[in-house]
């Protein structure tokens, strides 16, 4: 992660990509219990598909204070990089952030075909391995 290059040499950096949520929380609680300043740096925005609630609950239970700094989602970042707008007057004023069902099922009424029927901007996350399904659902929605 590029942001870690600004960490002081005295900082302990831990790559959590191979850790479970329980292991991450245990590590954070352990360091916080030693009165260390702990930062959990994530890509994107932790409040969007970031397991924020699941992470905060054990920290709250352990008495670890939590502060969340919002990030930039890939939907917003990609629009900025392309110098595009996600909304356009008289075309769409609505943006839906969603994903397709994979390991985690989608709630009733949130199927991609149903969402696409609104003909607004869709930012589709966590679905790169399901592109065939995304394409089929979008085509079926018209």
How would you name each of these model-derived features?
Residues 36-40, 95, 120-124:
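Generic beta-sheet signal
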Residues 6, 81-82, 137:
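Residue-level signal for well-ordered alpha-helical positions
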Residues 1-72, 77:
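Class I S-adenosyl-L-methionine
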Residues 43-118:
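Class I SAM-dependent methyltransferase SAM-binding "motif I" and its flanking Rossmann-like core
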Residues 17-18, 100, 125-129:
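Structural motif
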